[in-house]
């Protein structure tokens, strides 16, 4: 048995591969890389080949081991499921087979309909669409002595010798032919230490390699331009780079060939494909990173469907400058130095925090820089502690206007922290910062579950000012109540992100440092947690009981986060679980049910699938 893993985050530790990615990916795509891992890949285009899987914020790449070329294989927006399969790979030797992790990625792809494949030499045109369940008949076949499951489908031109001749006869100076040897016994050693594997999914432990002939078989030319935008943008052909093959009627679209640029969408059909990754290591966290990146992508893609949110965080059309990491680093350093100036007032700090938030939303590298040193995290938490749950400035206890300014600043700080936590689970510096001073993290938890104190309306003794002051008080009271609601929603989002930190610790990401049981034990010992949980249940009831009104993208993401918090309370805290069951059983019976969710949650949101699954789990725990 190997020694226990020390860092907990072996996401990017191969210097040779890192240099290769830096050279072959655009700067913004390289900065978006989250993790990579050596594995054995099985799909329709890969036959037990030893490669690196490279995960970014939007794409999954494959490259050789050692790296020679890189190609995109799956976009996260097309992913349907990511499962850990509990099986024993027969092609691996005994020691490696026992410690291997089998990861199955099911994704939707789009191909030309069968009647459109008659043109000689035309390959399938692939383009990402959102998933719809395909009712394909699976049949069993034998290949190299192994049992496979595949979609029952006639032989297509994609399998013909003509395709191989086309690929080999169109060399590019950047192209590298991909070897596709069949491997009977493969072995990978030195992959790290032993840890318990995450709970395997039993969705289809029988299925081994890839199914479906709809999987793309692109050439190995290095085509690394990342599709710009998220699902809120139109899925137009212009999103994917194309080049002419020399024939005026043939275009390469990404890595696929289309017989005519005016091909109608009516000739396309969606199918499910599978990508299988076999990781020979018990310490690898690539499965958790894949799940986390997919979830983060769906949250971000849903939020960007909100016009107001997108207008704040999406770059203006026509104003995009070339991406330069050096400029982002310089910008971050400047913001940080201005925030740390002595005698900074709240009015000076607020615009700097807002600028940092917008910059971090647009550039992941700022999130890395934020966690690289711990001082900015401690600074922001200490600022929150100055004003929450009550202000240290005694004047704010009587001054409603001042309290409004303080709450606005606190909301901005918490929103910034939400962004800094999101998508940074692969950063070892984040874990080190949070573990160095757990007292700061627990202080933050208390702040998040506590309702902010607001000043009471002061009596007015001047009779001539009574009418005017009453209107002013009503205005400030309404504004404060609105801010309290916004604060609660923002605190919910940050509590969700912190719960993920502890949950990932349970699953192997720094498990020696964090555990969900510690966090829930601490929370249930804090008196404000009961009021906080009650407010979440009431908000869920209010949101699902509104008649004939669809949830906005931001409301949909908030609902998902609320369900995740409720699930954590029900699973990991006996005290909170009993409180929810004893006090809100009727709400779950009459208001929080599947028909209400289906009426309010649009199917077009990427987060809908995850929310529905989480909703089922919460209902089952309440029963």
Swiss-Prot record:
Ranges of Low complexity composition bias in the record: 193-210
Polar residues composition bias: residue spans: 167-177
Biased composition, class Basic and acidic residues, residue ranges: 157-166
InterPro entries assigned: DUF4551
Highest taxon, organism lineage: Eukaryota
Pfam families from the UniProt entry: DUF4551
Region (Disordered), start-end ranges: 157-237
PANTHER family documented for this protein: RGD1561648
Protein's name according to its UniProt entry: Uncharacterized protein C12orf56 homolog
Organism: Macaca fascicularis (Crab-eating macaque)
């Amino acid at each position: 048995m190997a020694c226990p893993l020390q860092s907990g985050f072996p996401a990017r530790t191969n210097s040779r591969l890192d240099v290769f990615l830096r050279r072959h990916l655009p700067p913004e795509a390289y900065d978006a890389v989250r993790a990579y891992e050596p594995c054995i890949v099985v799909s329709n285009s890969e036959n037990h080949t030893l490669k690196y899987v490279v995960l970014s914020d939007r794409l999954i790449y494959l490259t050789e081991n050692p790296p020679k070329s890189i190609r995109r294989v799956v976009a996260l927006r097309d992913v349907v499921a990511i499962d850990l399969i509990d099986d024993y790979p027969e092609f691996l030797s005994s020691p490696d087979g026992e410690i291997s992790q089998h990861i199955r990625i099911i994704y939707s792809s789009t191909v030309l309909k069968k009647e459109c494949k008659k043109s000689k030499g035309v390959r399938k045109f692939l383009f990402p669409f959102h998933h719809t369940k395909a009712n394909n008949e699976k049949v069993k076949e034998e290949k190299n002595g192994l049992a496979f499951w595949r979609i029952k489908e006639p032989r297509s031109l994609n399998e013909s010798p003509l395709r191989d001749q086309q690929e080999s006869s169109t060399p590019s100076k950047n192209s590298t032919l991909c070897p596709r040897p069949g491997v009977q016994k493969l072995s990978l050693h030195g992959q790290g230490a032993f840890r318990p594997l995450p709970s395997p999914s039993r969705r289809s432990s029988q299925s081994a390699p890839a199914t479906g002939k709809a999987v793309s078989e692109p050439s190995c030319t290095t085509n690394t331009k990342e599709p710009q935008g998220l699902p809120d943008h139109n899925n137009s052909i212009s999103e994917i780079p194309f080049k002419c093959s020399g024939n005026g009627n043939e275009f390469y679209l990404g890595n696929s060939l289309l017989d005519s640029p005016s091909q109608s969408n009516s000739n396309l059909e969606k199918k499910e494909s599978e990508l299988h990754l076999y990781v020979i290591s018990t310490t690898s966290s690539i499965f958790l990173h894949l799940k986390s990146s997919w979830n983060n992508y769906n949250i971000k893609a849903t939020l960007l469907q909100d016009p107001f949110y997108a207008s704040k965080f999406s770059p203006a059309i026509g104003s995009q400058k070339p991406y330069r990491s050096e400029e982002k680093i310089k910008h971050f350093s400047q913001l940080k130095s201005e925030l740390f100036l002595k005698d900074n007032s709240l009015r000076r700090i607020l615009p700097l925090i807002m600028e940092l938030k917008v910059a971090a939303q647009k550039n992941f590298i700022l999130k890395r820089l934020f966690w690289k040193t711990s001082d900015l995290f401690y600074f922001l938490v200490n600022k929150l502690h100055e004003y929450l749950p009550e202000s240290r400035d005694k004047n704010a206890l009587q001054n409603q206007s001042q309290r409004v300014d303080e709450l606005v600043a606190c909301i901005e700080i918490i929103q910034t922290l939400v962004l800094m936590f999101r998508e940074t689970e692969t950063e070892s510096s984040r874990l080190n910062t949070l573990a160095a001073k757990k007292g700061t993290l627990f202080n933050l938890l208390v702040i998040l579950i506590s309702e902010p104190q607001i000043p009471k309306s002061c009596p007015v003794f001047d009779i001539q000012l009574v009418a005017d002051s009453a209107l002013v008080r009503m205005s400030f009271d309404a504004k404060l109540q609105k801010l309290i609601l916004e604060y609660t929603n923002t605190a919910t989002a940050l509590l969700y992100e912190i719960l993920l930190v502890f949950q990932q610790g349970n699953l192997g990401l720094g498990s020696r440092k964090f555990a969900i049981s510690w966090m829930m034990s601490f929370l249930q010992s804090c008196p404000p947690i009961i009021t906080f949980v009650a407010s979440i249940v009431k908000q869920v009831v209010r949101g699902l009981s509104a008649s004939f009104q669809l949830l906005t993208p931001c409301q949909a993401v908030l609902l998902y986060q609320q369900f995740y918090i409720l699930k954590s309370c029900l699973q990991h805290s006996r005290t909170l679980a009993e409180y929810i069951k004893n006090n809100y059983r009727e709400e779950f019976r009459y208001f929080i049910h599947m028909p209400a969710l289906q009426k309010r949650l649009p199917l077009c949101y990427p987060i809908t699938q995850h929310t529905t699954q989480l909703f089922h789990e919460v209902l089952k725990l309440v029963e």
